[in-house]
From Swiss-Prot:
GO terms for molecular function: xanthine phosphoribosyltransferase activity. Pfam families: Pribosyltran. Its EC number is 2.4.2.22. The gene is xpt. GO terms for biological process: purine ribonucleoside salvage; xanthine metabolic process; XMP salvage. Converts the preformed base xanthine, a product of nucleic acid breakdown, to xanthosine 5'-monophosphate (XMP), so it can be reused for RNA or DNA synthesis. Transmembrane segments: none annotated. Pathway: Purine metabolism; XMP biosynthesis via salvage pathway; XMP from xanthine: step 1/1. It comes from the Bacteria. Its main location: cytoplasm. This is Xanthine phosphoribosyltransferase.
Amino acid sequence: MKLLEEFIKEKGTVLPGNVLKVDAFLNHQIDPGLMQEMGKAFAERFQDLGITKIVTIESSGIAPAVFAGLALSVPVVFARKKKSVTLTDNLYTSTVYSYTKKESNDISVSKQFLTDADTILVIDDFLANGQAALGLLEIAELAGAKVAGIGIVIEKSFQQGRELLNKTGIPVYSLARIASLENEGILFLEEE
């Protein structure tokens, strides 16, 4: 998605350790116009798959997931990283490792909001090592839900995440695919 690539080039910052900081439009401050276009792009790609719900992880996946949900006219469910007094029982839970935070988190979805009647689209902000998406796939499997596709905002194609997700046989679509974050700047792969 050329618009997203422009945002990444203009407002993204490469940090040591192959970390891409995009808090100017995605991870801290959110650009609603960009989110709307991303939601439309995900909807166009997955509209014919019978999606009944979108599933993501808090917090940076929520905005793109909500805009995709608007475009597809389906609800959005986000896996919580922290338990709260209102989210204690009847949960599907998986453990995921965060590449940027260098820690593992249990993520949970209430059984009330995900069932074997659902066909879901998983949406996440980044694909690096694939752990977040795999955790959501595990939750879907526990619920008996069908996963029709995986939508990624920014994929670091030089890391193993895409390879791991491809092994699941579930279609993966990334709006921006980064080939490298080297000294010469951010290099993108061609659009899918």
